[in-house]
């Protein structure tokens, strides 16, 4: 995905901190999938379970930050996008990439023993990590409408405040109350929570919120005092993610993902903190031209890295027996992450050298 905006003179300029965030986010996404590999199969009291809780919780900002990066670019008034370009470039590229890689993963599943019918049908839904492509196409389609929201400061603030409450605060508070298990209230709260979930089904999701939030945070100057408070809140959000997941899972006697959702307040705090830190911590440094080119080069390969990384993780496990429990879990996880990141980068870089694949597949 491109990472350029129009400058005042009409020239396109890279936004380097968005490139840095994209690279960090793809690494975090890989770690998320690797740490989840055997997590649910472990006993809740196994030390490895807690390790994966710590590692997985540390990565949960990756999808929200990806969405904020896209929002910062697609909703930027200095980066006009025609409907023709939106459909024939952005949407078409995602669709063709999905079809190609869905076939690759379908064939991979078939070669690994999945019945031909199931392997064929999996092409229509894609591999487990490819749900994001459905989401991003939907956001591309509604981005012209969301530009109207972003273009009016009052409407934008109302939207962010309204859906911060509806999509994040209210359901999160109900989840916390259910976690406390106040006597004689559990059944009633559960019924209310289920009813609220039905309401959420008719509202724009937290993913649209992150898309719009990215534009807001990218364009707004945030005072240093507020940034420090947000960073502290982000750390608290991370600690809360780990502890709340642990508590909820022990309560239900299985791995419970309630507080790992993108719509959890704790994940929101982490995500906003990471994005703002990227904006101010990375953009105000003056890297040399060599480092700048390297960052841009890796960033431009991240889409291909996202598409292929799951294949590498599975190949390491199924063909070489390397997974997070092969030996000491932390070392195994970091080794798999290193191999996956480097391998994904090499494959994406090679595919990007073939013009037609670069245009439509990666």
Regions flagged by a language model, labelled:
Residues 1-362:
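Alpha-helical transmembrane segments and their immediate juxtamembrane cytosolic regions
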């Amino acid at each position: 995905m491109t990472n350029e905006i129009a400058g005042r003179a009409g020239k396109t300029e890279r936004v380097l901190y968005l490139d840095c965030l994209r690279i960090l986010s793809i690494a975090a996404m890989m770690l998320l999938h690797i740490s989840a590999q055997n997590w649910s199969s472990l006993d809740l009291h196994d030390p490895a379970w807690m390790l994966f809780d710590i590692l997985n919780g540390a990565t949960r900002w990756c999808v929200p930050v990806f969405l904020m990066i896209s929002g910062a670019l697609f909703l930027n008034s200095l980066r006009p996008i025609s409907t023709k370009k939106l459909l024939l470039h952005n949407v078409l590229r995602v669709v063709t990439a999905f079809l190609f890689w869905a076939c690759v993963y379908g064939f991979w599943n078939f070669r690994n023993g999945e019945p031909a019918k199931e392997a064929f049908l999996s092409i229509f839904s894609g591999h487990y990590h490819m749900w994001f492509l459905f989401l991003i196409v939907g956001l591309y389609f509604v981005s012209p409408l969301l530009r109207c929201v972003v273009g009016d400061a009052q409407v934008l603030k109302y939207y962010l405040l309204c859906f911060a409450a509806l999509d994040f605060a209210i359901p999160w508070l109900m989840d916390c109350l259910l976690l406390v298990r106040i006597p004689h209230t559990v059944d009633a709260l559960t019924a209310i929570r289920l009813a609220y979930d039905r309401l959420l089904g008719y509202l724009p999701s937290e993913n649209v919120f992150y898309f719009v939030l990215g534009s807001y945070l990218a364009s707004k100057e945030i005072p240093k005092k507020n940034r420090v408070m947000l960073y502290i809140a982000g750390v608290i959000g991370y600690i809360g993610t780990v502890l709340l997941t642990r508590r909820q899972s022990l309560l239900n006697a299985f791995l419970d993902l309630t507080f790992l959702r993108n719509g959890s307040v704790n994940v929101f705090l982490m995500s906003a903190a990471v994005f703002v830190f990227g904006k101010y911590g990375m953009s105000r440094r003056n890297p040399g031209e060599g480092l700048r080119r390297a960052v841009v080069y890796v960033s431009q390969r991240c889409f291909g890295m996202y598409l292929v990384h799951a294949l590498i993780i599975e190949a390491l496990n199924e063909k070489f027996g390397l997974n997070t429990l092969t030996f000491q879990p932390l070392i195994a996880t970091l080794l798999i992450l290193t191999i996956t990141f480097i391998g994904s980068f090499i494959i994406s870089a090679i595919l990007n050298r073939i013009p037609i694949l670069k245009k439509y597949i990666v």
